[in-house]
Each structure stands twice: as structure tokens, then as C-alpha cells.
């Protein structure tokens, strides 16, 4: 099943096309692959804990690959994000929630974290269509940090506004990780922006920038917030007179806000956060090439196990890239590639 996912056949009924492929059967040392019903019975028979066991297996494989490929990263950047898988059947766990491309349809919202330097998937899982809670986000970040190889000494974390919560900050701090998280709109934060002392931003694409200390409701202490302000065009102002839908609602400006424990200048914090766009590309690769969005069953546990099989196939490609680099090439210099 993993080899089928790896070479571009994400659905179990597609394996019949390569049932007698000489390369694949030669690798597996069989005359032909079993029929589709055999694969389906096998996947349905896997118990609920297999998904987490596969994450543990991938952790062990990662450590061995890094050792064999001479990857010695002491500093890593972890990018956490969610994606939306629209469902067209009656799969268990489907919810009508955030789904910008197919509004009103049920979906799953998996949560995934990648290592930016090597593009590896390190932790994640299939989730129902509801937005993740603060506890789920905090537990996920702790699991990510625990899954990193022992050679890693310093962690940097990046996440979008979907992870803007007290539990995420506390989880990063427990792991002694530095972080940058995009802020989410609240009335108090908007008021802080209006009161902030703005200055021209010469090293970013924004017109103005500012920073301030701020303690959101329910947080244990204040943190550093940095913000960029963009002036709206006349068309944007006119189009939003009837519908205000943006991060920070104001008649004249658009804002980008980040909470961070980095001490570097504002332009560096913004540049560092912008690099997490690679995580979205990695999710697209996993969805389109590794079959991540192919859910073979109506049962949530079966789809969760298949999710980890797809990500194992994705990681196999990343690990082969580590072995394929030139002897003196650093792992962080590898070019992005699709399966």
C-alpha cells in the first residue's frame, strides 16, 4: 500500500493497475499483488492505535536516516499548519466548519507539522472537521518536540492564526522553543493597534510598523507583539463597505500581527515568519502526490491509519533526497521536489 501511494496510486482500487508490474513485484518478491478486497480487509482490520504506532516507527526511521545520511541538525524550524479535506460521502467525523473552497460541505481538518530544513513530516494526524481546541494544539506541539532526533538542541516554531492561543505559547515554552505565531483578531488587540506608536517600515512591504507588549485575556503574562500596517486601495475600501472580512477591521488599513519571543528587529521577524509558506507547499504535495486526501473508508479510524500510511510514503521521498545530496551539501540546501 505504501509503495502504491509512493508511485502515485492513492486509492486501493487503483492497485490493480500495477498488480503485475515487474519492478514493484520484484521489490516485494511476489508474483502479483493481491486483489483489492484483500487490501481493504487489511486496512479495515488495523486497530485504532496503529496511527500512533506508525508515528513512533517514523520517528525511529528518521533517527536512523539522519545517522546514515550524516544529517546533524542542531537547530530546526518546525512549521505547523492545518488543511481542509472536503468530504463527498458520509464519512465518520465529517463536520460543516471552515471550508473556504467548498462552503457548507463537510470536511476533515488534519493537523500537520513539518521540519522546514529537510521537508520531513514529523507529527500530525487526521482530525474531524471542527477547529482544533487549545488543548489539542498544545498536545500536538509537545508531541512534535518529543519526536525530534536527540541531536536537535534548539527549536524554532512558526504557525498561523489558527494556532493563536495560550496553550500553544505554553507548549513552545515548555519545549524551550522560540516561536512566531500570527495573531487573531480580537477587540482588545485592535485597540492596542490603534494606540500603538507607528513608524515607517523601510525593510518590509508594509507602509508602517510597530511593536508593543500585550497580555491577551487568559494569558499568564505579556508578550512581544509586532505589527505591519498597509493602507487600503480605494477599491478595497469601497468593496468592504458592505462586507468587512479581514484580520483586523478598520476602514482605512489592513494589518498583520505576530506574537513572538524573538528579540530580533521587526523586519527579521516578518521575514522569518514568511518562510513558513513552504509548509503550505508541502501539504499540497502530500495532498496531490502522496494521496493524503484519499480517504478509503467511511470509518474514521480506518481513514486515520491510511493518513499515516500516506505520510510515510511522503517521508520516504524526503529521506531519499537526503541520501541523494552531494557529499558536502548541507541538508538545508536541498531543492524542493515533488514525488
Place the predicted regions along the sequence by residue.
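Short amphipathic alpha-helical "interface-anchor" segments enriched in bulky aromatics
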Residues: 15, 269-305, 309, 313-317
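Active-site-proximal, Lys/Arg-enriched surface segment
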Residues: 40-112
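Flexible loop/turn segments at secondary-structure boundaries
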Residues: 24-25, 85-87, 120, 130-131, ...
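Electropositive, glycine- and tryptophan-enriched low-complexity nucleic-acid-binding patches
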Residues: 100-150
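Short, conserved catalytic/metal-binding motifs centered on acidic residues
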Residues: 1, 15, 33-35, 39, ...
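An anionic, glycine-rich sequence signature occurring as long contiguous blocks
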Residues: 178-282, 286-288
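Short alpha-helical elements
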Residues: 1-72, 123-124, 139-161, 166-177, ...
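A short, flexible helix-boundary coil/loop motif
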Residues: 316-339
Amino acid at each position: 500500500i505504501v509503495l502504491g501511494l509512493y508511485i502515485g496510486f492513492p486509492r486501493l482500487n487503483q492497485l490493480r493497475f500495477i498488480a503485475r508490474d515487474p519492478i514493484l513485484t520484484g521489490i516485494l518478491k511476489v508474483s502479483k499483488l493481491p486483489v483489492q478486497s484483500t487490501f481493504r480487509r487489511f486496512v479495515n482490520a488495523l486497530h485504532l492505535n496503529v496511527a500512533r504506532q506508525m508515528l513512533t516507527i517514523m520517528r525511529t526511521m528518521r533517527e536512523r536516516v539522519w545517522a546514515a545520511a550524516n544529517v546533524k541538525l542542531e537547530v530546526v524550524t518546525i512549521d505547523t499548519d492545518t488543511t481542509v479535506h472536503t468530504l463527498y460521502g458520509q464519512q465518520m467525523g465529517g463536520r460543516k466548519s471552515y471550508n473556504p473552497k467548498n462552503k457548507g460541505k463537510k470536511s476533515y481538518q488534519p493537523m500537520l507539522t513539518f521540519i522546514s530544513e529537510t521537508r520531513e513530516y514529523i507529527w500530525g494526524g487526521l482530525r474531524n472537521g471542527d477547529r482544533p481546541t487549545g488543548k489539542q494544539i498544545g498536545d500536538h506541539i509537545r508531541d512534535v518536540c518529543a519526536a525530534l532526533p536527540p541531536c536537535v538542541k534548539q527549536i524554532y516554531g512558526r504557525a498561523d492564526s489558527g494556532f493563536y492561543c495560550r496553550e500553544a505559547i505554553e507548549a513552545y515554552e515548555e519545549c524551550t522553543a522560540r516561536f512566531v505565531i500570527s495573531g487573531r483578531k480580537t477587540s482588545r488587540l485592535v485597540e492596542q493597534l490603534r494606540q500603538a506608536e507607528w513608524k515607517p517600515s523601510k525593510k518590509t512591504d508594509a507602509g508602517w510598523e510597530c511593536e508593543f507588549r500585550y497580555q491577551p485575556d487568559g494569558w499568564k503574562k505579556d508578550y512581544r507583539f509586532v505589527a505591519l500596517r498597509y493602507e487600503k486601495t480605494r477599491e478595497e475600501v469601497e468593496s468592504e463597505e458592505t462586507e468587512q472580512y479581514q484580520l483586523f477591521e478598520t476602514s482605512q488599513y489592513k494589518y498583520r500581527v505576530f506574537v513572538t519571543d524573538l528579540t530580533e528587529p521587526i523586519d527579521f521577524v516578518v521575514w522569518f515568519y514568511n518562510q513558513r509558506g513552504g509548509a503550505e507547499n508541502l501539504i499540497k504535495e502530500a495532498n496531490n502526490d502522496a494521496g493524503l486526501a484519499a480517504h478509503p473508508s467511511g470509518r474514521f479510524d480506518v481513514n486515520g491509519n491510511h493518513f499515516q500510511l500516506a505520510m510515510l510514503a511522503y517521508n520516504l521521498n524526503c529521506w531519499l533526497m537526503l541520501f541523494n545530496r552531494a557529499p558536502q551539501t548541507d541538508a538545508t540546501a536541498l531543492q524542493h521536489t515533488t514525488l
